[in-house]
């Protein structure tokens, strides 16, 4: 089973002591820390499909206006390419996935190179950069950094993800 516990931590208290149950959380001082990379995906998924799903998720999470979704998508595509991905063939020589830091770097490069007005450049850098940077700081930043839990482990073992100690971003 996979239980994602957003509030009270009750499942962790009831089931967390069993030998075959792994509890992952946000505070590494209290339990094993959850580590995920939203830019990684399993074999059999095309990188462009994954990028499109990421853009859908970001659109649902953050208010996006004007060209922001297109700018973010371009930054994500460039981040994959800078990690060695061929987006057309959906192959990588290195099997390395980008991180939020990679996307932020590519976002700034892309906006600087673009034909947008200086006001628009500032708006896009400010709006998208701030949102992405919020995912690289504090506990959330720790979750999205480092070696992520393997999909096989996450989806085929008994896992409780305790998010009760983190607020919304």
Which residues does each PLM region occupy?
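P-loop NTPase motor domains
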Residues: 2-169
């Amino acid at each position: 089973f996979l239980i994602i516990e957003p509030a009270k931590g009750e499942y962790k208290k009831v089931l967390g002591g069993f030998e075959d149950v792994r509890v992952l959380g946000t505070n590494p001082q209290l339990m094993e820390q959850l580590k995920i990379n939203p830019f990684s995906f399993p074999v059999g998924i095309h990188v462009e499909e994954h990028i499109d799903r990421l853009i859908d998720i970001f659109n649902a999470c953050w208010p996006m206006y004007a060209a922001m979704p297109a700018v973010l998508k371009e930054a994500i595509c460039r981040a994959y390419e800078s990690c060695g991905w061929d987006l057309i063939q959906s192959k990588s020589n290195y099997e390395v996935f980008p991180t939020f830091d990679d996307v932020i770097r590519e976002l700034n490069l892309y906006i600087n190179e673009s034909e947008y007005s200086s006001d628009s450049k500032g708006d896009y850098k400010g709006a998208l950069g701030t949102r992405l940077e919020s995912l690289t700081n504090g506990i959330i930043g720790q979750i999205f950094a480092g070696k992520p839990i393997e999909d096989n482990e996450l989806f085929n073992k008994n896992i409780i993800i305790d998010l009760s100690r983190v607020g919304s971003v």
